Amino acid sequence: MFKIASSPHSHSGKLTARIMLWVILAMLPAIFAQLYYFGFGVLFQITIAVVFALCLEFLVTILRKKPKLFYISDFSVTLTALILAVAIPPYAPYWIILIGIFCAVILGKHVYGGLGQNPFNPAMVGYVVLLVSFPMQMTTWLAPVQLLHEPPTFIDAYHLIFSGGTTDGFSLHQLTASIDGMSSATPLDAVKTGLKANRGLAEINRSPLFTQSSLAGLGWFQVNLAFLLGGLFLVWKRIIHWQIPTALLITVCLFSLCSWLFSDNMPSPLWQLFSGATMFCAFFIATDPVTASITPKGKLVFGVLVGLLLCLIRFYGGYPDGAAFAILLANICVPLIDQYTRPRVTGYDLRGKN
């Protein structure tokens, strides 16, 4: 069972709704960056996710005979929907986000009793279910609109998501057919696939996805930078603690530094920090106050564990990015981490004797 630290206790004065709103506000720069580089599909995914999540939350509270307004007005389900919506490919079919939200809200949250009682991050539960069940849809990304000869319009985005093709009859794959095939993959996927095909890193970096950006791939670097700025804002506002993102990013940096120094075909540590979901994971997912460690030392251990698992899966696993799996695996370890990192009670030594 989870344990509560010994008194005295202090109240932070921060309401759940206020915390959630600050986090949503901090995500806006990254959402705008994603919208600029990856098109209008982002808006559709967010709208579908938030509306369906609120409706599902309303229905579940009725079935569980819980206060409906109380659960919806804390914005927790809105944040869950927002996190999942920006994590999936912007032009994924509409039913992908519907299934993901259902799994996040039901399997990731209410099965365990609701907010505050779930051991796993709900958004990552939904994401992993989607990634394992629908790998093709979850790994097909449209190239940044700056690389496309005819970027999808708002109407095209609607038709791509709801019918699988634009008004002119082009599918998602056909939109990137005139560009190097690497451009339809994420930078992490492009590098991993290229290395498996015995292509050198220098050759991979000549792809249009990399030539128009100095670091980590066009669009992806900018989105990660926006998440970093939003995360630093949350640390400054004391909405999240500094230990988890700091420990996570240092671990990723050190792990990638060792790989980079001993191999010419490994991207630099800076590349690893600003690619994939690294910054998103460090500041907005791993810092979930419900599913992360609650002790000061435990937060450091938790951050290191997430960073280590992320790198192991990213470098040696079958998936290009291991953020979601790293979070869920680390969530399993939280009770054990908290058990062995509890602060010493005032007036007692480490053995528990006064």
Swiss-Prot record:
Annotated S-S bridges: none
Kindly list the cofactors needed. FMN
Gene Ontology terms: biological process:
electron transport chain; transmembrane transport
The way it spans or sits in the membrane comes to:
Multi-pass membrane protein
What InterPro entries does the record point to? Answer: NqrB/RnfD (IPR004338), RnfD_bac (IPR011303)
Enzyme Commission number(s):
7.-.-.-
Residues spanning the membrane: 19-39, 40-60, 70-89, 94-116, 123-143, 215-235, 242-262, 266-286, 300-320, 321-341
**Could you tell me where this protein is found in the cell?**
Cell inner membrane
Task: List UniProt keywords, sorted A-Z.
Answer: Cell inner membrane, Cell membrane, Electron transport, Flavoprotein, FMN, Membrane, Phosphoprotein, Translocase, Transmembrane, Transmembrane helix, Transport
Q: Which residues carry this modification: FMN phosphoryl threonine?
A: 186
Q: Which GO terms describe its cellular component?
A: plasma membrane
Could you say which residues form the signal peptide?
Answer: none
Instruction: Enumerate the Pfam families for this protein.
Output: NQR2_RnfD_RnfE
Top enzyme class, one word, equals: translocase
The family line of this record is:
Belongs to the NqrB/RnfD family.
Subunit description:
The complex is composed of six subunits: RnfA, RnfB, RnfC, RnfD, RnfE and RnfG.
For this protein, the record's NCBIfam families field holds:
PRK00816.1, rnfD
Task: Give the matching PANTHER family.
Answer: ELECTRON TRANSPORT COMPLEX PROTEIN RNFD, ION-TRANSLOCATING OXIDOREDUCTASE COMPLEX SUBUNIT D
Q: Its function?
A: Part of a membrane-bound complex that couples electron transfer with translocation of ions across the membrane.
Protein name (Swiss-Prot/TrEMBL): Ion-translocating oxidoreductase complex subunit D
- Tell me what organism the protein belongs to: Mannheimia succiniciproducens (strain KCTC 0769BP / MBEL55E)
> What gene name is listed for this protein?
rnfD
